[in-house]
Amino acid sequence: MTLNSLLLEQKCPKILVLGAGISGKACAIWLSTFDCDIDLVDSRKIELKKNLPSNITFFPSCIFAKINLKKYHGVVVSPGLSPHEKSVNNFFIINKLASDHGIPIWTEVDLFFSALEMKANKTTVESKIIAVTGTNGKTTVVSMVKDLLKNLGYDVELAGNVGTSLLEALMERMQNGKFPAFWVLELSSFQLFLSSDFKSDVSVILNFSSDHLDWHSSE
């Protein structure tokens, strides 16, 4: 189930956001703009510097294995959490329980694409997505693509694994009331691994080599 489908079918859905880093906080704040009840959790003992909207509850020092997943309609996962690491403070247990109970799992990439789909249904102006991934060279390539398009006179937004997170860039554009002609996205393997509802107009895969094996667990 996509986020858009859930928002249509369920009144005030309860959503769990795992990880309170840059991506996790952006996801929680984006979801707070809808009629959602959000629990933002992190295994670390941290304090958030910014005040959160009233429909977000933050739980630091959380043991993921003790979360009652059945009360949630959906789970959003931060890219730093590996689905392979089998500790009580990681995502393996949540991934298995969500699968067992049919609870959808989304990433920031999925939420970003859902937001663009919602906008596309309300306007005739459609932004194109250029997504770049690979082991090496992503930042160089997205910077070149951005500069090429800007030199051709297009409004371009660079986001993702470089500079501004996807949803932070999206919310800033919404505030300004102007969407770009092109979104140029740098996406890591972490961001794409669990994404299930993302489509780009142009996809670029640069290269693959052994890297981040602590996250991927094997080659």
What is each residue range found by the language model?
Residues P53-I67:
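Glycine-rich, highly charged phosphate/nucleotide-binding loops
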Residues C36-N51:
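NAD(P)-binding Rossmann-fold cofactor-contacting core
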Residues P13-A26:
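Glycine-rich adenosine-cofactor-binding loop
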Residues G21, R44, V162:
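Residues in the short beta-alpha loop(s) of Rossmann-like NAD(P)-binding domains
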Residues P13, S32-T33, A65-K70, P79, ...:
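Phosphate-binding loop of NTP-binding sites
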Residues S23, I46, F190:
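Conserved Rossmann-like nucleotide-cofactor binding loop
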